């Protein structure tokens, strides 16, 4: 407190010394009296200087106060946002402290169970502390940025005042330019009206010319089409007539050839007729001497005379002559028919020649008409040329007038373009300044939103850590239940061993429902009911499922050593302390005192288990039993009551399961696939295989494993996290952390106290990495 009071003393001494020097330097006429108004001169000068400085300070302070009133609204908003951020920061710190306390309590409880869990919790606590430190650093950076932005806003507001003055000057120039543009627009409108009148007259003339050209073209096309159609028709008819003429000529030539052949044939026949007549006369003379000839023939028949040959030849000749007469008559008829056809062909030929002459006359008339139309077309084309020349002269006159008007209009448009450029520049400057102001406001809003999102993300992480702690606690409680259930199974097996010691036939009675063929006394009768074979069981076991026998059945009458109740911590042994794998791998071992129901070789053949890490085939799957789930309030009914254990998934308890938990479940399947662990499906296998059942060798397992899901064809482990514990597990109420409806997909919880390595969160990508500090998570 003494230092600020001691600092102004040397400054006052220096001021007084300078004042004395100034007074000493003044002339005697200018020096004041030694005691004006009863005060020394030094005090008066000091008071005047101090008053001058006070007035300057007052003016500067008033200017600052007047200037600061303009920013009161902005400062209030920024103060509200800063207060909200500070409150959220305080809440986060409180939540972080509570979470740290919960983690510390949880670590104290879990340190007795496993040392690996403590390391994971310590690493997570360190990561949370590092994130808190990063949050504090980011908050300090935010405050520095807010101060810089306030300075920028002040500078921009001073620029805005200058821009307003420029806008006033620009508006005045704009008004003067608008007046000039209105006068120019009126002149342009008058010029456009004149141009429109010229265009209307040009359009009318062009329409008349087009109509005349269209009519001429239509007449020409119609004339050509008619001429072409008629010419095509006549060409087709002429071609058909030529074809008919050619066919008739060919038929005429063929008929003439046939006639010549027939005439030659007739001549040959007429030459043979006199010969035939002479032969006929000779035959008549021979008929008179038939009687004599008969005697001669009879006399010469035996001698083999050849008198029959000339008679047969004469008969053949007569028959041939008759046939020739018939053919001659037919040839004459054909000849007459061909002559008639030739006469008809001559008539058609004459008609065709007349028709061709008519066509030639029509063609000459059409050619004369075509010449007339061509002359008319030439006259019309000459008229069109004259009209086009007249219209071209008018167009040249109008074009000259339009060029003069267009030049005047271009000059006016250039003036207007210059004015518009000035206006556009002014508007662009205004827009740039407005954009700068908007960008600064948006950057402020983005900074606020960015840090709000960071706060929300840290709240989410805290909530997810809290959920992970709950799931870990539930996992512990479920493991305790499983251990209790396994202890109950041990007590049941001990009771069964006692029953077997008292009555060795009780084993056959309990397993007749599944393995009657393997019994030593042969299969049971078909009419015997399953309830009769369960006479030695307790009434509690008869109410529910049949008793699940232990994985290894006793061979002798003594009791085996009792180990710990958890089957996961030791390898299952038989009654004599030998592991079950010895029985499977030693097929030549002698049977026990009581005797097994089947030989070891048969047991090996019946029990074909796949190697570790592979699944059962579909045909070799053991019968499955329905799994059950016990609630937190459910108790075990008795020592001999078998129950199977099943864990519900997080999908039913806490909503949809995140993708990371599904991947961790798949990793759990891969990691635990090489281990053969007894589960709730083993009793069902024992019941199904009968008293001679021997399980496969089991490898020693260390570490916590999860219950097996036997509903599918492949044996799978349950989810890595059991259902969450009650809300009051860590001392805080369940409503302390209210559920939040965060946008987007749900975040995966931290893998707290899990057998799998923790997975890092993805980095947060900022929308504008060039402006804000780059946060490192």
Curated annotation (Swiss-Prot):
Subcellular localization, as worded in the UniProt entry: Membrane
Membrane topology classification: Single-pass membrane protein
InterPro entries for the chain: cTAGE_MIA/OTOR
Any one annotated GO CC term: endoplasmic reticulum membrane
Gene3D superfamilies: 1.20.5.340
Key word Transmembrane helix present: yes
Family as reported in the entry's similarity comment: Belongs to the cTAGE family.
Name of the protein described by the UniProt record: cTAGE family member 6
Species the sequence originates in: Homo sapiens (Human)
Species lineage: Eukaryota, Metazoa, Chordata, Craniata, Vertebrata
């Amino acid at each position: 407190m003494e230092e600020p009071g001691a600092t102004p003393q040397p400054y006052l001494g220096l001021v007084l010394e300078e004042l004395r020097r100034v007074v000493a330097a003044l002339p005697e006429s200018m020096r004041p009296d030694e005691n004006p108004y009863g005060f020394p001169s030094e005090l008066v000068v000091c008071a005047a200087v101090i008053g001058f400085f006070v007035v300057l300070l007052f003016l500067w302070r008033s200017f600052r106060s007047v200037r600061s009133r303009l920013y009161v609204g902005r400062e209030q908003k920024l103060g509200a946002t800063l207060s909200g951020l500070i409150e959220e920061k305080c809440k986060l710190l409180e939540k972080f402290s509570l979470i740290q306390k919960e983690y510390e309590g949880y670590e104290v409880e879990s340190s007795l169970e496993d040392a690996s869990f403590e390391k994971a919790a310590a690493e997570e606590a360190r990561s949370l502390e590092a994130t808190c430190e990063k949050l504090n650093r980011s908050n300090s950076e935010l405050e520095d940025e807010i101060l810089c932005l306030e300075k920028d806003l002040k500078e921009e507001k001073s620029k805005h005042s200058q821009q307003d003055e420029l806008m006033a000057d620009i508006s005045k120039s704009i008004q003067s330019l608008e007046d000039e543009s209105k006068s120019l627009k009126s002149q342009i409108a008058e010029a456009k009206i004149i141009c429109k009148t010229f265009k209307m007259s040009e359009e009318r003339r062009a329409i008349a010319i087009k109509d005349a050209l269209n009519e001429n073209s239509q007449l020409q096309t119609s004339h050509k089409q008619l001429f072409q159609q008629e010419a095509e028709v006549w060409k087709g008819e002429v071609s058909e007539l030529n074809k008919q003429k050619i066919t008739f000529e060919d038929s005429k030539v063929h008929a003439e050839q046939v006639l010549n052949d027939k005439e030659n044939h007739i001549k040959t026949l007429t030459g043979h007729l006199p010969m035939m007549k002479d032969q006929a006369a000779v035959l008549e003379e021979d008929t008179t001497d038939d009687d004599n000839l008969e005697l001669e023939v009879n006399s010469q028949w035996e001698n083999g005379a050849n008198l029959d040959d000339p008679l047969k030849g004469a008969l053949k000749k007569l028959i041939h002559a008759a046939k020739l007469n018939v053919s001659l008559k037919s040839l004459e008829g054909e000849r007459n028919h061909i002559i008639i056809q030739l006469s008809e062909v001559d008539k058609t030929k004459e008609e065709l020649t007349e028709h061709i002459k008519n066509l030639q006359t029509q063609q000459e008339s059409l050619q004369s008409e075509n010449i007339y139309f061509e002359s008319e077309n030439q006259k019309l084309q000459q008229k069109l040329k004259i009209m086009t020349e007249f219209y071209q002269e008018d167009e040249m006159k109008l074009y000259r007038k339009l060029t003069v008007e267009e030049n005047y209009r271009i000059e006016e448009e250039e003036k207007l373009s210059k004015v518009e450029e000035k206006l556009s520049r002014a508007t662009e400057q205004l827009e740039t300044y407005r954009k700068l102001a908007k960008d600064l406001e948006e950057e402020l809003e983005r900074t606020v939103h960015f840090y709000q999102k960071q706060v929300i993300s840290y709240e989410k992480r805290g909530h997810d850590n809290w959920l992970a702690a709950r799931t870990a606690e539930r996992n512990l409680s479920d493991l305790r239940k499983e251990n209790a259930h396994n202890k109950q199974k041990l007590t049941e097996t001990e009771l069964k061993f006692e029953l077997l010691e008292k009555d060795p036939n009780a084993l056959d009675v309990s397993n007749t429902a599944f393995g009657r063929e393997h019994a030593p006394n042969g299969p049971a009768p078909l009419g015997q009911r399953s309830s009769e074979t369960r006479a030695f069981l307790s009434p509690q076991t008869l109410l529910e499922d049949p008793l699940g026998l232990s994985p290894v059945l006793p061979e002798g009458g003594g009791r085996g050593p009792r180990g710990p109740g958890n089957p996961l911590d030791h390898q299952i042994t038989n009654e004599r302390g030998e592991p079950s794998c010895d029985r499977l791998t030693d097929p030549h071992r002698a049977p026990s005192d009581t005797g097994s129901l089947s030989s070891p070789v048969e047991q090996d053949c019946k029990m074909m288990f796949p190697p570790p890490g592979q699944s059962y085939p579909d045909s070799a799957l053991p019968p499955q039993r329905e799994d059950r789930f016990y609630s937190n309030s459910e108790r075990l009914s008795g020592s001999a009551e078998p129950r199977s254990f099943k864990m519900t998934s997080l999908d039913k308890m806490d909503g949809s399961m995140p993708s990371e938990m599904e991947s961790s479940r798949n990793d759990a399947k891969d990691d635990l696939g090489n281990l053969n662990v007894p589960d709730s499906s083993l009793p069902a296998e024992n019941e199904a295989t009968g008293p001679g059942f021997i399980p496969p060798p089991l490898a020693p397992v260390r570490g916590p494993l999860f219950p097996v899901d036997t509903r599918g064809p492949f044996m799978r482990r349950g989810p890595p996290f059991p259902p969450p514990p009650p809300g009051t597990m860590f001392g805080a109420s369940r409503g302390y952390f209210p559920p939040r409806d965060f946008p987007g997909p749900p975040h995966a919880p931290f893998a707290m106290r899990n057998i799998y390595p923790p997975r890092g969160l993805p980095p947060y990508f900022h929308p504008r990495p060039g402006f804000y500090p780059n946060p490192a998570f």
